[in-house]
A protein has these predicted regions:
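Polytopic alpha-helical membrane proteins, predominantly small-molecule transporters/carriers
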Residues: 1-364
Length: 364
């Protein structure tokens, strides 16, 4: 029996994706503890920790000979994964700007929504597996889960627009200091679509994963060498941009100036990177649990991030003083997001059951 089959567990896969979504929703919180540093300075530390240190340490800890695997991998596949990561890097740079203008709840709802739709539906089509999206009970259920998650995202977005119309600027800016819906919406659209490059990259390293398995890595951790390459592409963009801003804004001294809590800043900025990277570690380790329905993992990851980020937004007061209608839209949207994850988990169960079923008797 195939090793991957032995590890298939759709319910556990959905839970792992959901934990990744939680990490994606809260990674920004440690930045609030960074004192007297420019954005580019703490984002640089975040990038070094989350895009370089964590993935490489994890790859060497969980994978058999990751360097050897990457040396044997097709150069074209490595380049594509790297470039997809760089595409994400361009989108990821504006993720923080999106949150600055829209707040955690609304910003991640719109950005993750576009990222979810693009990153879930496009990879199977590019790989010539369009038929995987429909035709069997498990595929139909998984597609239904994706559609429901997108419906939930739309409702959360509608609730956000309703909130934007209802609240006076002073209340909105009390919760989100630089609130600007128009700027935020434009940034979120760009960031969401470009950030889907992460999904393309993480799902585009099949040969690398096969080599990792052949080297003796378990099915659960076979994707770590792919993660390293994709995040390296993202790091390149983030590093160059932050370095440019450090030079332009004369903030290179942030890393050494004595009047700031240097150790605390390094710890909290680095912690944000570690938490952020955790969502994609969860994505790659959850994939093998889903079997043939692994492509829906991106939708579950994004839906979970929106669910948890919206709940965090509620906790932070971003939805305070809104109308019953707005809160109702928000509540229904959150229920749909939660329900989509349940349906996606059930789709994996259907797929597992269909494979376990004995073939029908053939009449002579």
């Amino acid at each position: 029996m195939d090793t991957a089959q032995l590890t298939t567990n759709p319910a556990l896969g959905v839970l792992i994706f959901a934990l990744g979504g939680l990490a994606g929703a809260v990674f920004y919180i440690p930045f609030k503890k960074v004192k007297n540093w420019a954005w580019e300075s703490y984002w640089m530390i975040y990038a070094v920790a989350g895009l370089v240190l964590v993935p490489w340490v994890l790859a060497f800890s969980t994978s058999a000979d990751p360097i050897g695997v990457l040396k044997k991998a097709p150069s074209g596949e490595i380049l594509r994964c790297y470039l997809y990561g760089a595409t994400w890097g361009v989108g990821g740079l504006t993720w923080g700007l999106m949150i600055r203008y829209l707040g955690v709840g609304l910003g991640l709802a719109i950005g993750c929504g576009l990222c979810s739709a693009t990153g879930t539906l496009i990879p199977p089509i590019l790989e010539g597996r369009f038929h995987d999206l429909y035709g069997t009970p498990s595929a139909n259920a998984s597609l239904l889960g994706v559609v429901i998650s997108l419906a939930g995202i739309v409702l959360v977005g509608m609730a956000g627009m309703s909130k934007e119309k209802e609240l006076p600027d002073e209340i909105k800016k009390k919760a989100v200091a630089e609130y600007n819906f128009t700027k935020g919406l434009l940034v979120a659209c760009f960031s969401g679509i470009m950030s889907a490059g992460m999904s393309f990259g993480l799902q585009g390293g099949k040969n690398i994963e096969s080599l990792s398995l052949a080297a003796g890595t378990s099915a659960t951790w076979k994707g770590m060498p792919v993660l390293v390459i994709v995040l390296l592409g993202g790091f390149t963009i983030n590093f160059l941009w932050c370095l440019y801003l450090n030079i332009k804004n004369k903030t290179l001294g942030d890393y050494v100036k004595p009047q700031t809590p240097l150790l605390g800043n390094l710890i909290f900025a680095g912690l944000a990177g570690v938490i952020w990277c955790s969502q994609f570690i969860c994505f790659k380790t959850g994939e093998p649990k889903m079997g043939d329905m692994a492509y829906v993992g991106w939708a579950v990851l994004m839906a979970s991030a929106i669910l948890f980020s919206t709940l965090l937004g509620i906790f932070l007061g971003e939805w305070k003083s809104t109308s019953v209608r707005t809160r109702s839209l928000l509540a229904v949207g959150l229920v749909l997001l939660l329900g989509s994850s349940v349906i996606t988990g059930y789709s994996g169960y259907l797929g597992k059951q269909s494979k376990a079923a004995p073939p029908a008797d053939v009449k002579q």
